[in-house]
Each structure stands twice: as structure tokens, then as C-alpha cells.
A protein has these predicted regions:
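Iron-sulfur-cluster electron-transfer modules
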Residues: 15, 21-24, 54-228, 234-275
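Ferredoxin-type iron-sulfur electron-transfer modules and their immediate structural context
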Residues: 1-75
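Conserved beta-strand edge residues that scaffold enzyme active sites
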Residues: 41, 229-230
Length: 276
């Protein structure tokens, strides 16, 4: 992990616009967040903790530090799991701060043509499309069966550890959406709508189906929402804030069109945090 003050090339933008300075002032630097942060636990580096990142953001906003490539790398290194928020006595909205800064950094980044094309395909064509996701995951499944994922670093420019960390694609029988309705078992306790998500049906479909069975066993009729794919959480985490908002609005409209009075249940924490 590079030091966040290394690399002297600043981003071509007004440094003070990169950070939500008002929110950064809420941090009292108590350090309770350190034990909850996976990147701090991995590296032991203060810079890779929520407190350290807030210190960096504040320094950039106050023009005490340059918004270098190292600063951007540290912002990208955060998982935005928001576990730190659960223990913060000051109520710092760390997730909102990270999304704001990542969005501003993305606006000012100068990516190469291959990187721009890959992001356009992934965020504009694959994630918002059930067919696009199915084709992409099917291609990944074939590559894993043929042991071609080791070629990904050379072909797609991906880092080796990224391809090594990709989960095995489950069998096709598990990669299916929920039925339109799963009836309640026993005495009915009401109806719920399930947000299936985009990646969940393709890589963790059995979790969605287990969720539906559990809710049905508890007495709830489970309804899925037609034509819903992506809520925009992955876009927000990666600085694509405008499209994230568009997808969130579309998701809300589709759920309201089915039943705007039903509780919404989901099993993906990232989707839940984004939609809230």
C-alpha cells in the first residue's frame, strides 16, 4: 500500500471541492473506529483507518495537503462497509463522505481508453441489465472451468490478486431469479417485497432463495419486483454518483408500482445501505 502523501501529481481540480469539509469536522479522533476497520486491521496503518482518511480529507480541503495520486489510492482502498459508523460516538457519516470524495475524484480523473471502456461496459451495460449480467457471469464461469482466469491480468489489465479473489460461479440451477410470488406457509402475517439485486442472483442466488423460503415459513407472502436489476450501490461506491441516483430512483419507482405500502426485505447489506 502506497503512502497517501506519495506521488506528487495533483488531480486537475480545485482541491477544496474534493471533500465534504463540514462533515469531516464531526470527527473527534477518538479512535473507536480502528478496531472495526478491515483495511486498518490488514495494514496496521493509521492512514488506512477511518480516522486517518478523515484527517487526509480535512488536510486536502484546508489545502495543507495536495490531492495526490496517493490520496486517491487511499480513498479507493476503503471498502465503504461503514462498520465504523456503528461505533462512532460523534455520528460521523463516513460513508457519505467517501462517496462524495470518490465522486469528485472520478470527475477529475484522466483514465486511459481501455479503463474508460471497461468502466462504461461494466457500469452502463452490464450491471443495469439482467441479460448483460447473465452473459458476463456465464463468460466468467466458462473461463473458470477452462482455467483461463490466470490470463486476465494480461488480457484485461487486472491485478492477479483480483482474479484470484473472484468467487466460483455457482451452477446454473442456482442462478435463477425468484418466482413472482412465494406463498406464505401457515397463517399469513402479511406481504413483503424482496430486492434481489444485480450480483446476488448470479453469484449468491441460493441466498436469495433461502431468504424467500425463510420469510414464507414465517408466514409472509414474498413478492419479487419485475424488471428490477441494479439499485446503483456499486456505482456509488465507485464514484459514478449520477447514475447511482438514476438507478436508485428507478428502483424506488418499480417497487412503488408493485405496492408502495409493503415492507422491503433484502439480504445484501450494500444495497440496503445505499437505498436507505
Amino acid at each position: 500500500m502506497s503512502d497517501a502523501t506519495s506521488h506528487t501529481r495533483p488531480f486537475p481540480t480545485d482541491a477544496t471541492s474534493l471533500v465534504d469539509h463540514a462533515r469531516s469536522l464531526d470527527c473527534i479522533h477518538c479512535g473507536l473506529c480502528l478496531t472495526t476497520c478491515p483495511t486498518y486491521q490488514l495494514t496496521g496503518s493509521e492512514t488506512s483507518s477511518p480516522r486517518g482518511r478523515i484527517h487526509l480529507m480535512r488536510a486536502v480541503a484546508e489545502e495543507r495537503e495536495e490531492p495526490t495520486a496517493g490520496f486517491a489510492e487511499e480513498m479507493d482502498f476503503c471498502l465503504v462497509c461503514r462498520h465504523c459508523e456503528s461505533v462512532c460516538p460523534a455520528g460521523v457519516e463516513f460513508g457519505a463522505m467517501m462517496e462524495f470524495t470518490r465522486g469528485k475524484l472520478e470527475e477529475s480523473r484522466k483514465r486511459g481508453p481501455i479503463a474508460r471502456l471497461a468502466r462504461w461496459i461494466g457500469f452502463r451495460r452490464v450491471l443495469p441489465s439482467r441479460l448483460g449480467l447473465r452473459l458476463a457471469v456465464s463468460g466468467l464461469a466458462l473461463a473458470q472451468r477452462l482455467r483461463l482466469t490466470r490470463l486476465a491480468p494480461m488480457v484485461a489489465g487486472l491485478r492477479g490478486e483480483v482474479t484470484a479473489a473472484l468467487p466460483p460461479v455457482p451452477p446454473r440451477r442456482e442462478r435463477r431469479p425468484l418466482p413472482p410470488t412465494t406463498p406464505a406457509r401457515g397463517e399469513s402475517r402479511g406481504r413483503v417485497l424482496v430486492l434481489e439485486g444485480c450480483v446476488m442472483p448470479e453469484l449468491f442466488g441460493r441466498v436469495n432463495h433461502a431468504e424467500a423460503r425463510l420469510l414464507a415459513a414465517a408466514g409472509f407472502e414474498v413478492a419479487s419486483v419485475p424488471k428490477h436489476v441494479c439499485c446503483g450501490a456499486l456505482h456509488a461506491h465507485n464514484g459514478e454518483l449520477e447514475q447511482a441516483r438514476e438507478l436508485a430512483r428507478s428502483t424506488i419507482e418499480r417497487f412503488d408500482a408493485v405496492d408502495d405500502s409493503c415492507p422491503v426485505v433484502l439480504d445484501s447489506a450494500g444495497c440496503g445501505a445505499h437505498m436507505r
